[in-house]
Amino acid sequence: MKTILVVDDELASAEVLSLILEEEGYRTFCTANGQQGLARVRDIQPQLVVLDYMMPVMNGADMAQALREMPETRHIKILMNSSLPEDAVRLHFSKYDAFLRKPYNVDVALSLIASLLKA
């Protein structure tokens, strides 16, 4: 079973996505910021992190950068999402595997997640 960590300060949104992913057969966990997300990654060793770009404490770009810098987490797929256009996000960080603009269509998100986990 593939494990996905959803990191988003909008916890209701994260929990809804988590429930949808669980219905699709994934094991999911949620955290509210990048700092909590990094701590959780060490415990659960996910194959994918669905990461909100704009969060307090540690934003998505900083968490993604930390994941890419550590040899033990460098392989984890990152799906960055934001209400900002992707061009604005890429100005600050571009080492993610895919981007999803909020609000997103659930079917599009599921398809993207499935393709990331197959790669």
Predicted feature residues:
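Short hydrophobic/Thr-rich beta-strand motif most characteristic of the beta2 strand and flanking loop
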Residues: 25-32, 40
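Hydrophobic/aromatic residues positioned on beta-strands within the core alpha/beta folds
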Residues: 79-81
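Active-site residues of response regulator receiver
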Residues: 52
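C-terminal output helix
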Residues: 104-115
